[in-house]
Regions:
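Beta-loop-alpha module in the N-terminal Rossmann-like domain of NAD(P)-dependent dehydrogenases
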Residues: 3-47, 51-65
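A contiguous active-site-proximal alpha/beta segment in oxidoreductase catalytic domains
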Residues: 12, 20, 52-117
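Short catalytic-loop micro-motif centered on adjacent basic/acidic residues
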Residues: 22-23, 46-48, 73-76, 166-168
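NAD(P)-dinucleotide binding in Rossmann-like oxidoreductases
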Residues: 157-208
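A structural signal for short coil/turn segments at secondary-structure junctions
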Residues: 41, 69-70, 95, 124-127
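Short beta->alpha connector loops
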Residues: 26-29, 52-53, 79-81, 171-174
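Short loop/edge segments at beta-strand edges and connector loops
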Residues: 7-9, 48, 75-77, 133-135
Length: 208
């Protein structure tokens, strides 16, 4: 099957009707791109990269736009879609609390915490999450993306079920990120480089 790829320098070159738009621009311009695209074209579905926006007003205005237009929209939080976590979820006993801990060095706490927050919500089946303790380092660092910043430290939070999440990002040499999921009596430990897991341990000999 032949697939034709077309490259355009502006929205004006795109077809009038689009089944899907993926907006993976920097967060500083994403709101403008989204508004222009939905104003100029008929859009059936949207996928947005995180972090969504840099300004609170953008969240409010885009939320109103999407509700008015009824365009189905997703944020790219991919961890819940992986086979590993899909297999772990049914092994958890939701009659007991889930304790999730993420620890590593320079994993981009400012931009990537959302992935672990979403995974926590997926595994617990509870979306009313909030941080209860914030312990960030004073020094703000330059992000790998020019003009953006990152930070390190520790964030602790939970939900109404009593589940807890502990995010630790250290300012040390790059190394693996450890994800530990405790749900008595089960314990799952994953060492990852964020994209691919390369070491996995389970208390019940579960082997994905």
């Amino acid at each position: 099957q032949n697939i034709e790829l077309c490259y355009h320098k502006s929205l004006d070159g795109l077809p009038d009707s689009l089944d899907l738009i993926i907006i993976a621009t920097n967060s500083s311009v994403r709101s403008d791109v989204l508004k222009n695209a939905t104003r100029k074209r008929s859009v059936k579905n949207l996928i947005l990269e995180k972090v969504l926006f840099q300004k609170k007003i953008d969240y409010i205005s885009v939320d109103k736009l999407l509700k008015k237009s009824s365009i189905p929209t997703w944020v790219s939080c991919w961890m819940r879609t992986t086979d590993l976590f899909k297999q772990i979820k049914p092994l958890l006993n939701l009659n007991d609390c889930i304790q999730m801990k993420v620890e590593g060095s320079k994993w981009g706490m400012g931009s990537n915490s959302i992935h672990y927050m979403d995974l926590f919500s997926y595994l617990s089946g509870c979306n009313d999450f909030k941080f209860t303790e914030v312990h960030l380092e004073d020094e703000v660092q330059d992000s790998k993306r020019e003009g953006f910043k990152e930070f390190t430290g520790r964030l602790k939070g939970g939900n109404s079920r009593g589940d807890s999440i502990d995010l630790i990002c250290q300012d040390e040499q790059d190394g693996p990120i450890t994800i530990e999921i405790q749900n008595s009596p089960e314990r799952f430990t994953l060492a990852t480089n964020f994209v691919n897991h390369f070491e996995f341990k389970s208390s019940n000999l579960f082997n994905p």
